[in-house]
């Protein structure tokens, strides 16, 4: 387990990342293991609102699962950024760009991590699920699969039409304003909803898994997205319980 703290040029600040690396097995030769030049699959694991990069380390068995499966797990700090580019703050905080334009090259360059699409997976919880869907639908060429726990792409047109009666209106209104207005939002990476159909038509799209609890506040949005995804033919697993 490695904890990194470094200056990010995309975020304009120091940032934290936790990285779980595969462990040498009992009885293996250390020299042979560390010089093997083997490349390992990577899981990009994104935390939720009010969380941080070590949430999964503290509250799950992710290190055990990663070790059992010879998997590198990368857990970046995203603060409460919604995995968006915040250009109207000083200095700018470009979280969306950070993962693909800075952190991925760092991990691929410094660690025995495979950069092949079939070896890269992304997963997130809540805000992290929104982030995972942003990356997977904007960069489907980078990921073999995407898992979203308690979070799905938002139908921004419906939310804006419903206004304050929609529980997600206040949050999405800020995102729309940050993008420069509704038209700019609809033409940006933030508009994941409209990218779903494009990905659904790919010959070899990423695999998708969406799960949500039936008592979760996100559940109505989750059902709305499920109906839309099934209508346009997105190949995905939807799990509710």
Segments (PLM) and residue ranges:
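Non-catalytic cap/lid and distal C-terminal segments of serine-dependent acyl enzymes
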Residues: 1-241
